[in-house]
């Protein structure tokens, strides 16, 4: 699985810690991590939580990522922004049990974490435990066991509902403010990470032409 890490500007200084912790957990499982930044608070490409949502939508809908890890100060804004896009099911995780239950019950493809709120001593330990519970036990298996059937049924229903209530990502890219879009994909390593991994020719061609 290809996991993309996105950090918005208010918590950009924590990107190295988050990346290191994520890689420590998921690379031994056979997963790949692509770090889309921000890398420091002074990056030329300033990603807000709204841009983090747009970038998550681009990565997941193009197939350039299978999963997105993002967040903001509280995680709430990033979650809302991510869920405004098609093909993105983003959960808000604050502890390891959230990670396990989101993976098993909701079976989403994106998570938003609080990187300021309650992020003090031992923060990297909590992150490590969250990532282990999120990625270490498969997805969509249900929890508790007696709730597996209705949970899996509801997940399929939610996917069908989102397909109806959201527009195609390529249409959004055409209609969204183009300056905002260009800023979102102007990260230092966006091109080298995104275009080789992109599986949607229309999305890739449109972004490359900007």
Question: Positions of the model-derived regions?
Answer:
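C-terminal binding/interaction regions
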Residues: 4-17, 100-210
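Short, solvent-exposed amphipathic alpha-helices that sit
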Residues: 14-29
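Short glycine/serine/threonine-rich phosphate/pyrophosphate-binding segments
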Residues: 15-16, 53, 75-81
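A short beta-strand-loop structural module common to alpha/beta enzyme folds
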Residues: 29-46
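Short, ordered loop/turn segments at secondary-structure junctions
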Residues: 38-39, 73-74, 97, 115-118
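Short, structured active-site "lid" loops
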Residues: 48-67
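A short, small-residue-rich loop immediately preceding and capping a beta-strand
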Residues: 65-71, 90
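Short Gly/Thr/Asp-enriched flexible loops that form oxyanion-binding sites at enzyme active sites
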Residues: 77-90, 94-95
């Amino acid at each position: 699985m290809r996991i993309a890490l996105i950090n918005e500007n208010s918590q950009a200084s924590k990107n190295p810690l988050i990346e290191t912790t994520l890689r420590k957990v998921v690379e031994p499982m056979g997963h790949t991590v692509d770090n889309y930044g921000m890398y420091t608070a002074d990056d030329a490409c300033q990603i807000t939580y709204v841009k983090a949502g747009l970038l998550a939508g681009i990565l997941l809908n193009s197939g350039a990522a299978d999963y997105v890890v993002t967040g903001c100060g509280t995680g709430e804004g990033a979650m809302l922004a991510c869920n405004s896009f098609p093909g993105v099911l983003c959960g808000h995780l604050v502890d390891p049990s959230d990670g396990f239950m989101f993976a098993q019950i909701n079976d989403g493809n994106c998570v938003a974490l609080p990187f300021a709120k309650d992020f003090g001593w031992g923060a990297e330990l909590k992150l490590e435990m969250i990532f282990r519970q999120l990625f270490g036990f498969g997805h969509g298996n249900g929890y508790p066991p007696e709730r597996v059937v209705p949970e899996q049924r509801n997940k399929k229903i939610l996917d069908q509902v989102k397909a109806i209530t959201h527009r195609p990502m390529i249409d959004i890219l055409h209609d969204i403010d183009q300056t905002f879009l260009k800023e979102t994909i102007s990260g230092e390593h966006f091109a080298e990470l995104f275009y080789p991994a992109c599986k949607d020719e229309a999305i890739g061609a449109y972004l490359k032409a900007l």
